[in-house]
Amino acid sequence: MNVEELVQRYSAGERDFSIIDLRGAVLEEINLSGAILHGAMLDGANLRRANLSQATLSGAALKGADLTQADLSGADLSDAVLDEAILEGAILDSAILDQADLKAANLAGAVLSEADLSEADLEAANLTGADLEVANLHQANLSKAALERANLEGANLEDVNLAGAKLEDAKLEDTVLESGDSTLIS
């Protein structure tokens, strides 16, 4: 299936595009709100400013994909692979990212308020200025992550690996840190 066919089928009311292969495709500003893209292969795809709100992207491959300013609010990205993906300024509020792989992803300025990032791998991710208010990061790997100026107010950081993470000027009011790595600033 190509991009044109995807758009036509979505416009006709179809929503299940599981395991679709659109690696490297240009999907800039596409509206796939509520689409089922479970296991989709979207490595290197251009999804800048795409509307993927409430979409199911569980198990999707998005390595190196560009999701700059994309709307992923309420989306299910559990077990998705987003290594080195660009999510700068993306909206991920209330998104499900449990066990997602976000190693070296760029989430600078992203909105992740109330997102579920439990057991997510965010090693060396850039979360500078990101909004993680009331996010669940239980057992997440944030080693070597850049969290400068991030808003972590009320976030759950229980059993989180923060080794080498940078949290200068981060907002940490009401943050839960029990059993986690208490070395917050390296």
Regions found by a protein language model. Give the residues of each.
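Tandem repeat scaffolds
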Residues: 2-186
